[in-house]
Design a protein with these regions (language model features):
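Active-site rim segments in enzyme catalytic domains, especially the processed small/beta chain
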Residues: 142-205
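Alpha-helical cores of eukaryotic small-GTPase signaling modules
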Residues: 1-22
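A short, hydrophobic/aromatic-rich structural module that often spans a beta strand
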Residues: 89-90, 94, 174, 178, ...
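Extended, loop-rich substrate-binding clefts of extracytoplasmic carbohydrate-active enzymes
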Residues: 109-122, 188-216
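Carbohydrate-active enzyme catalytic cores, enriched for enzymes
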Residues: 19-161
Length: 216
């Protein structure tokens, strides 16, 4: 009696919270991993109990997998952007295996990030404006910031979320200065407004035009 409504609600959430390219509004890679892990668990459970898997669930899993592969470093962890940490490489590996989505050459762009590869070296860069809507309360001023890894060694990383260290560090970690990118006189590429949700301040005055071009 509860399964039908639960799956119906899940279908609505998949439709409204994840777009057709497997992207969530927050642009937080670790949050996307959490979503992906839960969806693959549901898919596996339905398969084991011979219950049809909703088409929208299968579709979103198929599109999230390559996004997460694009945002992985050589050690299997995720790039730290917009409040996300590195995530668990083991949880990601398990979720990818359960998904059944075969690995391919990583996308060079996904969820507002660009990826470059050369041998064992990979670079992941934020090439979009910070997210708006509710996500603006946790977004970082990280436009044009990057992380760089060689093999399993991460050489250049961002500070990540400072939330666990208190309000002041939470704000500081969201500023441009806490990211691997160029800054001008200590100013952030996006400004903080006075609007708050709990202890979180919203970003405002985000970059209007962010373009990227890849040349061989």
């Amino acid at each position: 009696q509860l399964l039908g409504p639960a799956l119906g609600a899940l279908e609505v959430e998949c439709q409204t919270q994840i777009d057709a390219e497997g992207v969530i509004n927050s642009r937080n890679p670790e949050e996307l991993l959490d979503v992906f892990s839960l969806l693959t668990w549901v898919k596996q459970t339905l398969n084991m109990t011979k219950i049809p898997v909703p088409d929208i669930l299968t579709d979103r899993v198929a599109h999230i997998a390559p996004v997460l592969r694009c945002l992985r470093h050589g050690d299997g962890t995720l790039a730290r952007f917009h409040g996300g940490g590195q995530g668990s490489e083991h949880i990601l590996d398990q979720a990818l295996a359960i998904s059944g989505v075969r690995p391919s050459v990583p996308q060079d762009r996904a969820m507002g990030f660009a990826r470059l590869n050369a041998g064992a070296t990979s670079l992941i860069m934020d090439v979009a404006a910070p997210p708006l809507g509710p996500a603006r309360f946790s977004a970082h001023a990280s436009t044009c910031a990057f992380e760089l890894s060689v093999g399993r060694n991460r050489l250049v990383v961002n500070c990540g979320s400072g939330l666990s260290f208190g309000d002041d560090w939470q704000i500081a970690s969201r500023s441009t200065a806490s990211h691997a990118t160029a800054g001008i006189e200590g100013l952030s590429s996006s400004r903080f407004s006075h609007a708050k949700r709990g202890h979180f301040q919203a970003l405002k005055e985000t970059p209007k035009i962010v373009s990227v071009q890849k040349t061989e």
